[in-house]
Amino acid sequence: MFVNIHRNGAMGVPPKCTRQIVHHHTKMGKIMADLFEKKIIFDLECYPSLFVLSALSLETGEMQSFTSPRDAYEYVRANGDALFIGYNSNAYDDHIINFILGVNGECTASDVREISDALINDGIPVRINRFRSYDVYDPIEAGMRSLKMFCGSYGHTTYDSPYSFKDEREYTPAEVKEIVGYCEQDVYYTRDVFNNEFGYYEAACARVPVLQEYGISFDDPRRVVCCRSAALARNVFSAMCTNGRSPKDDARTTIKFAIDYTTREGIGDAYAFYRNIVEKGDELSSKEEFYNKETPTVRLLDGLDVALGWGGAHGAIEGYVKPDDVKILYADVSSMYPTLMIKHDFYPYTFTPHARGLYEFLYHSRLTYKKQGEKLKSQAAKRLIASLTGMLKDKFAVFRSEWSNNSITINGQLSVTDLAYQLSKHFRIVQVNTDGVMAEVKSGEEETFRRIVDEWCVLYKYEVSSHEVKELVQLNVNNYYMVDEEGVTVKGASFSLNRDYFNDKAVCKKALPLSVVRKCDPLEIMKDINDIRDYLILIKTTDTFPYLYDTLSGECTESRCIRCIAAKPNGQLAKLAGVRFVNYVKMRSSKDKSNTQKVSDFPTCAVELPDDLSTYDTDALLALLDKDFYAQKVRTLAQPFQEKKEDARCLFALDLSSVQTSPKPLPYPTDAHTTAFVFDRVRR
């Protein structure tokens, strides 16, 4: 293993870095302990008779492409000290490169294709990495595995190769050049994702000094950057934990309860539900039976139902808007699961004292780093802790202890429901989530709220941050818009503003909570929103309907993601803006125009926009824009709130500038053939 544990040695000193890292087209700020001088963005394509590797040096900006495994082998070997950066490469590209390195490049495109088919059809084998790689997709967890869809959301017009991956024929030089162009396009897209999500890379670098401070060193610290958080946590903790599964690891002996819940009013039935499962459970119990049992619901004194489940406790007033005559206080538990593990001794039996020591070090360090403003270190420690807790159910982890994990989650549910019930004796509960409770508190009742929370904290040994929620628009527990002392928080698809690249009709997500809070028509809100990017509508194809057909021009485009805006049917304004009207439908085949599917929620009149809007007259586009189309969408979405909270009024007007949704325009390669290829290519 590459982990060296020095239990009594001197603590490692985090290396300092004052160097400026400059990426191709993008200047990044200082980063912590960047362990790689050379970074290369790469992508590859595997056809039955053609292999392509394209690689872009971030330091020099040079793009190189190779069409034989041998040439690719020589390039990777010559850059053995570099970090190779791919998109979703952990699942595919890394395995291909490792195969080529393993046979010293002595293979054909057909041999590589066999490995590719095995990866796709038979799953991912255990990989021994022969080079250093970093997957930009892995930490993002965007739920969008397609790179082209991802960058289509950025605003790029994206294309797929017109050549089938099942086509076994030889390609002409012109066709090879075209396929290489597609591969290079994906490299530039990966570059953009890496630059925009650079904080994840910085956090990966921060793992090294965090673990060094505990006395853990590494034979090759650069491998730490390449590891997923889960893999690193598994590696580090496995070296400290006992091996094998104990016969005592069952529900009866492992699931513990933090307090005597029989003394707590209101949650007796929920406790009895779990207690009954535990008393009947053992190692031979069917896990399916254990998890498929219908979990209980607790009704609070104010009538709100809190549903308990293996993922946490949840309850919320649906269609809620904060009134102006009360304040909402939010009791938010800090690091609930680690706190239960440490302060109630819910450690798995596999943890040695040294493993416990590291876990507690990460727990306390994360809080210390956060207070000191060291966000990268705090985030690195947080991810290691979260990964470790989740891996207690991982059948491949040496330290796995499934029932220990259940012990943590069950007590988390019971304890937060207990707090909600105690608060419901005095206050109206607005929301209950996995690690916190929101309640309406009238003026003069704040001390009662804090007293109940403080007593609860002493009982469960929690630390809670209680703060005021200034504004709340809540569709349900999974969809809400909140403004508090930390800024704007959004959750769920209805209000999602937290990922800049998911900006499809972002104006609707901005205007919905603001129009409800201010009790005004969405058009009034939209008068002040004049960034054309907030009005973009993304049209994404599917595997079933992979083509987009414009019924007005009769053209079929290969683009996997097109962006448009709703427009007024005014040809003169369109001409002044330099755009044309489009009406897209999806097609199964580019040759069969009868087999189409309507694009959901597509405006009657629309214009298509490219990724670079800098050459367009913004005033002309705004004059053409049909804001009423978007306002009508918001009116429909706002109906549940207006029906349930017609008397809601706003305490203050929200500052629109506090919500940032539109990404900055991204630079694109200036290489002539690539630029022309990306912007001008419309086939068939």
At which residue positions do the language-model features occur?
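Active-site-proximal helix-loop-helix substrate-binding element of RNase H-like nuclease domains
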Residues: 84-89, 94, 105-187, 385
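Conserved RNase H-like, two-metal-ion catalytic cores of nucleic-acid enzymes
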Residues: 27-119, 289-290, 294-301, 305, ...
